[in-house]
Structure formats: structure tokens, C-alpha cells
A protein has these predicted regions:
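Extreme N-terminal tail/first-helix region
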Residues: 1-17
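Charged, gly/pro-rich active-site loop segments
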Residues: 1-5, 77-138
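Short beta-strand segments
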Residues: 17-52, 67-70, 81-82
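A short beta-turn/loop motif at secondary-structure boundaries
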Residues: 28-30, 73-76, 114
């Protein structure tokens, strides 16, 4: 699998509010996947945000390796998957990070203001892309 940086056409795919799935590892090594939102924060870091009470947060604290697969919302046969580590876990006390992600996806701040949130950034180690939209346009 290629290492970063990702090519410009894949960064463009990641800049859009596409559907995606994140995989974490349970302590017994079993992978767990869940749909999530993300935001390409810089060209090599992806922001994700979790409810502070979610079990996957415990898994990430024990083993920060994750995989994120982003599907092109216009053609789900096109996708990019990144494997890396979820780093810099921080409490999102003022909900600024989840609001940035929510505005990206739904156009307004995150509606549930009563539960704690935690932000983390995926540092990409490897990536893989597939499908017509994963190839550079000539």
C-alpha cells in the first residue's frame, strides 16, 4: 500500500462530506466497524469525533490503530481507505470540533449539546484507493 502523501485527486474526495466507516480493534483483536463523520483537517490528518461514553474510545486508548474507509457519495464503488493511528485525543469541551464536522455534513452545529465529546486525529501510515473516481483525471 502507498504511504502518504495522498495524491491531490484523493484529497479532493476526502474534502467532501462523504459516507465513511471507521474500524477499531477490541482488546481481543476483533475488529469493530461503525459509520462515522470525518473532516480532512490538513492534507495528512483526518479529524474524527466520538461521544465520550462510546466503547470504541476505550478500544482506541488501548490500541490507537484504526482504518477509515471513505466512500464517494456519488459512486460507492469509488473509495479510499487509510490505515493509521488515532492520535492527540482531546476532550471537545466546547464542541467546536464536532460543530466543524457537523457543519461540513449537515450545514449547522451538532444538535446534541448534552453529552461529552472527544476528538482525535488520524495520522495516515498507508492508504489504498479503488474505483473510477480513485484514478487521476486526465
Amino acid at each position: 500500500m502507498p504511504r502518504p502523501p495522498l495524491p491531490a485527486h484523493l484529497l479532493e474526495l476526502l474534502r467532501r462530506p462523504n459516507p465513511c466507516v471507521i474500524a477499531t480493534l477490541r482488546p481481543d483483536g476483533q475488529p469493530v466497524t461503525v459509520a462515522t463523520w470525518y473532516l480532512l483537517d490538513t492534507d495528512d490528518r483526518i479529524l474524527v469525533n466520538m461521544d465520550a461514553g462510546r466503547r470504541r474510545l476505550e478500544y482506541i486508548r488501548q490500541d490507537p490503530r484504526v482504518s477509515l474507509t471513505v466512500l464517494d457519495g456519488d459512486d460507492w464503488s469509488t473509495h479510499v481507505s487509510v490505515q493509521g493511528r488515532l492520535v492527540d485525543l482531546t476532550d471537545d469541551n466546547d464542541l467546536a470540533d464536532i460543530d466543524r464536522i457537523a457543519i461540513h455534513y449537515i450545514g449547522h452545529p451538532y444538535p446534541n449539546r448534552s453529552r461529552g465529546r472527544v476528538s482525535g486525529w488520524i495520522d495516515t501510515d498507508f492508504w489504498h484507493a479503488w474505483g473510477p473516481g480513485a484514478k487521476p483525471q486526465s
